[in-house]
A protein has these predicted regions:
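Sec-dependent signal peptide recognition
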Residues: 2-10
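Low-complexity, acidic/polar, glycine-enriched regions of mature
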Residues: 19-133
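Sec/Tat signal peptide C-region and signal peptidase I cleavage site
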Residues: 7, 15-22
Length: 133
């Protein structure tokens, strides 16, 4: 679950926002990437190709009013198809049974420069609270 937290925080903070408004993430200019330990020796990097997110951000207060994201688990791509198939299997994401992972923000706190977003992350039908920094 730790690397999924990095995925979501990368999605949230990897694009610039300008005025108070509601946004849909532009998949051309953002990505949902991850890095995970492999055999405790190296890191495997990858991304999810299909996702969407809805954001309501207030530039004046530098705060998120709402944030939610849906990631298609079958769109995982590490550059090695055999590994991707394994990640889609019941051993990991169980993409056929659980095609989406979701994050829904519950609260956001900021000191003006950095922020912490608390919310619920759901993977394989299991929801856990996480804090993104």
């Amino acid at each position: 679950m730790r690397f999924i937290t990095k995925i979501t925080s990368t999605l949230i903070f990897s694009f610039g926002l300008v005025n108070a408004a509601s946004y849909s993430v532009d998949n051309v200019h953002t990505n949902v990437g991850f890095s995970a330990k492999h055999m405790m020796i190296t890191n495997v990097k990858g991304e999810f190709k299909t996702y969407d997110a809805q954001i309501d951000f207030d530039e004046a207060t530098k705060s998120f009013k709402t944030f939610s994201a849906n990631v298609n688990t079958a769109s995982v791509d590490t550059g090695i198809e055999k590994r991707d198939e394994h990640l889609r299997s019941d051993d990991f994401f169980a993409s056929e049974k659980f095609p989406k992972m979701t994050f829904v923000m519950k609260s956001y706190e900021s000191d003006g420069n950095e922020g912490k977003m608390k919310g619920d992350l759901t993977i394989r039908g299991i929801t856990k609270p996480v804090t993104l920094e």
